[in-house]
């Protein structure tokens, strides 16, 4: 909980941060989209085409597009729960009628370089000039995440880069998804493993 408070205190100082309230234009939103008060959209690229939300979707969590790349596309009638954080520097595509529960984390990249010297340089740049000063990803690896239609991601799940979750799949609470999930299957655990067909 302490990390979350620090994270949001840093984010809120960013000029590209938008705390969603009444009638705040932040992205390309179709008719009937609801952005709940307290949700957040951080679009470091300040380009509305980088965050697209389909009609009748409900966003209670946070959507973040990094300054050096990324795109988030959410289909129609999908739900992003409170405390969920979806962060992209490559591409995250979420289908129609997807349920993403509270406190889910979806990240399409490593977040940091693997070499400690490179991490130190990046960290110092962020401290001195802000996260939005990063204009390239350096050696951070990113791979597209795809979540197909009618998927249910239960609470406290982590989905890592390069994962493709097939249509109608369910990911059990607290799972860490590092590999593709077949359509109409239930996976759970750390790492997430096949449990049964649906």
Feature locations, PLM:
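Domain-scale signature associated with acetyltransferase and cell-envelope carbohydrate enzymes
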Residues: 1-114, 118-125, 131-132, 137-150, ...
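Nucleotide-sugar donor-binding/catalytic module of glycosyltransferases
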Residues: 164
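A generic "structured core" feature
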Residues: 170, 175-176
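Gly/Pro- and small hydrophobic-enriched strand-loop and loop-to-helix capping segments
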Residues: 178-184
